[in-house]
Amino acid sequence: MEKVIIIGAGPAGLTAAIELLKNGGDYDVTILEGSQAMGGISQTVRYNGNRMDIGGHRFFSKNQQVMDWWADLMPLQGKPAYDDKKLGHEKPLAENGPDPETEDNVMLVRDRVSRIYYNKHFFDYPISMKPETIKNMGFVTTMKAGFSYLWACVFKKPETNLENFYINRFGKVLYSMFFEGYTEKLWGRHPSEISADWGSQRVKGLSITALLKDMFKKVFGTKNKGEVETSLIEQFWYPKYGPGQLWETAAEKVKELGGKILTGCQVKKIMCEGRKVTSVVCDTAEGEKTFTGDIFISSMPVKDLILGMDGTKPCDTIIKIAEGLPYRDFVTVGLLVNKLNLKNETNKTTLGNIVPDCWIYVQDKGVKLGRIQIFNNWSPYMVEKPEDTVWIGLEYFCAEGDDFWNMSEEDCVKFATAELVKMGVISENEVLDSHREKVKKAYPAYFDTYKHFDTMIKFLDTFPNLYCVGRNGQHRYNNMDHSMLTAMETAEAIKTGKKSRKDIWNVNTEKEYHEEKSGN
C-alpha cells in the first residue's frame, strides 16, 4: 500500500484524498493541515451565532464531474429555504431532496446578485447595457464609453499586460471607471505592471461583446450552462451554513474512507534525496514531527515549498524565482448592523428589504475597501437573526506586515466602520458586533518573478513523486472548482501511473478547458 502525504486540507487536498480513497482505493492517505479549520480560504468562521464566508464562494462549475461531486456530499434542497418560503420565491427543487428548515446537510440554490458601487450609484457586475447603466453614467460618459469601445475593437493593443487586456475588451473609458482602481486595490500594483494571465484565467471570455451576446440569448432563451461565462451566471449552489460546511463534510468523508487528517501540523521542511521527496517535517504543539511517504501532494504556497526543500537544495535560479513570487494578503472585517442605508430599488424582494447583493464591488478610489459581502443573501442560515440584523463582511487586500495588516482589531474595525459611514452605507451608531479575520497568501499574484514560472514548473516536474495542486500549490488564482480539478487530475495520474503532469498544470489555462472536459 502506497503512503500518500497531502499538504493542506483545502478544497484541493480534501478532493485529492477522497478521489484516491473512494471505490476501495488502496492508499494510506494522511492530510497535514497547519490550522484547525477545514477548507483553507473556503472555510466558514463562526462568531457569536453568525457565520462568515472568508472570501465568498459560489458553488458553480462548467464541469459536471465537480457539480456531481458536490451534490454527492451535500444533496440539493427539496424544499424552499427560510427566506424563499417567506418571500414566495421559486427555486428549482430536487425530488426527495432535504428540507433546509429541518435538515442541515443541504445545498441551497441562491440568486447571484453582484453589483458595483461607484460614485454612490449601483452598476451591474459585470457592466450591462441597461437603461439604468446609461442613466447612472450620464449621456456624455455613455457616448464616450461607446466610442472608446469601438476604438478598442479596431485598434487592438498587444496583450502584454492586464491593462491592455481590459482595454481590448471594454475600451479605455470603462476600463478607467470600473477596472483600473479596483485592480490596483486588489494587487497593490497598477494593471500595466501585471501579467495578462490573470485576466485570461479570471475574466476569460468576458467583454462588451460577451455581455451583448448574453443579453440576446437571455431574450431568446438559447443559453445553456456550458456557454455561460462564470462571471455571468444567475444562480449558484451554496451550503446551508457556508462553504466550510461542505469541506467539513468532505473531511468526515476522508476519515470514513480510512484517511487521516492531522490539524496543527505546519509543514516547514520538505526532505529530498536527489529528485525524490522522502518526508516532510512539521511544527506541531508537541514539537517537530516527521512524516515519511511514497507520494506527496502539495497545496502549500510554491514559495514555501521551494524554500523549505532540504537534503537536495534547488539551484540558485529556482530559489530566486521562489523568493520573488508575489502574494496578496487578505483581511475581512465582519460587522453586525441594525440596517444598511442602501435602498433596495431592485425588483428582488429580500428579508428586511435589504439590497439583494451577495457581493458589492467598491470602485471608489477614496476608500481602501475592496468588496462588501452581505451574508444574509448568501444564506439566511448564516445569520442568527436574519430579519432583524444585517451581517456583512468588508474585504481588504493588503500585504502581510504593512500598516493595515498590523492594525489592532479595534483600530481595524474603527477604520472599516468609518469607511462605510463615509460611503453612506451605514450610520455610525448601527454597529452591534464585529470580528476580524486575517489570511496570509490569499491571492497568488502575477508580477515580479511570476514571468519565470514556466521554469519553476519544469523544475517541480522533475520530482516524480511530487504533485502540486490548488491555488497556492500552482501559484494560480483559481476558482474553487479549478482547484478541485487539479486534485482530480492528480488522483487519476497516480492511479493510472501517468507520468506527465501536463493535464494537472493545464487546468484553467485555456478558455475552453471546462467545455471540452465536460462535453458541453
Q: PLM ranges: what are they?
A:
Residues 2-31:
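N-terminal Rossmann-like FAD-binding beta1-loop-alpha1 element of flavoenzymes
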